[in-house]
Amino acid sequence: FRAVMMKLLGLLYSAIVDADTTALMTHGHQEGVAKGYVPKRRHRGPSYAPLFSSEGRTGISLGAELRAGNVHSSTGAWDFLKLILSKLPSTIATSRIRTRLDGAFYNKELINCFEKEGFGYVIVARMTDPLKRTMYSARYHEFARGWEAASFTYTPFHWNKEYRFVAVRRPQKFEPEEVQRHLFTFKHYTYHRAMVTNLELTPEAVW
């Protein structure tokens, strides 16, 4: 089965590598369990926090690593991802491999590893007040009815250089109140997320 999956991957011109952590609740005293970092499950009981990876378009599993519930997603993430990336077919050039990660993986060390090895990445940014201010003042353009995107450079605290960020927003009038409660607003706009990336794509394509 594994050989079949790798053969299917070999047919791809490019690859999107997704990775995420989930919580597996346990009962009893199994080895390696601990209260975890996954926000929705934190403090509910002992768990594992396995790290999974799959190809973003085909859904093909690329690998997994079973970890204790109190291990943060970004801890050891590069070692895991480096192994995953090394297993991709050699027919897919490094320049055509992109990695997508959520905010739990947002840190300078991991991003520097991607840049050093030449892999593309899109990582959801952790929202800080300085980033929000930069995001609010960026120049946005409409790419779909009610949707606007912007690209801007920003230097996070202690990161020592500028990185490219992409943000997406909608006028509040287009956004249901239920959605607005889970996002943040500024001057009649609801902001969905900001992402740091090294991809040379339009903001809407990154999003």
Task: Kindly label every feature range from the protein language model.
Residues 13-24, 59, 97-106, 121, ...:
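Short, conserved catalytic/metal-binding motifs centered on acidic residues
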Residues 37-92, 193:
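Electropositive, glycine- and tryptophan-enriched low-complexity nucleic-acid-binding patches
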Residues 27-33, 38, 62-66, 108-114, ...:
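Short acidic, glycine/serine/threonine-rich loops at helix termini
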Residues 24-26, 60, 70-73, 104-109, ...:
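Flexible loop/turn segments at secondary-structure boundaries
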Residues 1-52:
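Active-site-proximal, Lys/Arg-enriched surface segment
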